């Protein structure tokens, strides 16, 4: 799956 690194990883800060 080719996606943005920001979207691939879960929201740590949940911002």
UniProtKB/Swiss-Prot annotation:
Disulfide feature: none
Classify the source by domain of life: Eukaryota
BPTI/Kunitz inhibitor domain ranges (all copies): 1-15
The UniProt GO MF terms for this protein read: toxin activity
* Alphabetized UniProt keyword annotations: Disulfide bond, Neurotoxin, Presynaptic neurotoxin, Secreted, Toxin
GO cellular component terms, alphabetically, are:
extracellular region
Query: Where does the record place it?
Result: Secreted
User: How would you summarize where this protein is expressed among tissues?
Assistant: Expressed by the venom gland.
- Record flagged with keyword Oxidoreductase: no
On assembly, the entry states: Heterodimer; disulfide-linked. The A chains have phospholipase A2 activity and the B chains show homology with the basic protease inhibitors.
The role this protein plays is: Neurotoxin T1-2 is a presynaptic neurotoxin of the venom that exhibits indirect hemolytic activity against human erythrocytes. The B chain is homologous to venom basic protease inhibitors but has no protease inhibitor activity and is non-toxic.
State the similarity comment.
Belongs to the venom Kunitz-type family.
Q: In its UniProt entry, what is this protein called?
A: Kunitz-type serine protease inhibitor homolog T1-2 B chain
């Amino acid at each position: 799956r080719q996606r943005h690194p920001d979207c691939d990883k879960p929201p740590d800060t949940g911002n």
